[in-house]
Amino acid sequence: MLITNQTESNLKNVLELEVKKIPGMKYVADYLSVNQQEQLLNIIDQQSWSKELDRNIQQYGYTYQHSETGAVVASKHLGNLPDWADCLAKQLARDFPLTSTSQVLDQLLVNEYQPGQGCKSHIDCVPCFGNTIFLISLGSQCVIEFIHSQTKEQVPILLLPGSLVVLQGAARYTWRHGITSSKLDKYQGKEFVRSRRVSLTFREVLFPHK
């Protein structure tokens, strides 16, 4: 299904209600303009991709070891974020002030999802990262599934291109999130065919991992 202006307006109204079911979550459907999205994708695609996972990724700031336990290794500090990423990280911190000690977003994970690819349901490593997680979507729309770790309540959220998700409080620590490995999403009775999607996850690395 193509997302027209009318469809997007209706979806935003639905999403506003759905997001309220997840305490600590903020959703900005059009955080980045179409031009900003295109510029970011162009920059990202000029960088080298790693095939560490079953999908392409890029890591900046610190390397996160993707495993069952997950860890950030201080010895694998990659240096400061590149200018394009640092600029966006500072913008996020201004728009949504951090309450942590350092108040600096210093780790970025870029994921590329081709149609049919997804990620397991998870909570971002609690001892590794601060209390605010930022997720930006570029390219295709996609449904992300939030599951309460205790009640198992499920809340699907449609991530629109250029959208921003902010996870704090219960949304950060109690709700798992993941993306099914599918080429098609169903949301609110409508079908959305996936194309290439790139996500940016900004986080703050905690001591003693630095």
Indicate where each model-derived feature is located.
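Non-heme Fe(II) oxygenase metal-center motifs and adjacent flexible, charged/small-residue loops
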Residues: M1-K210
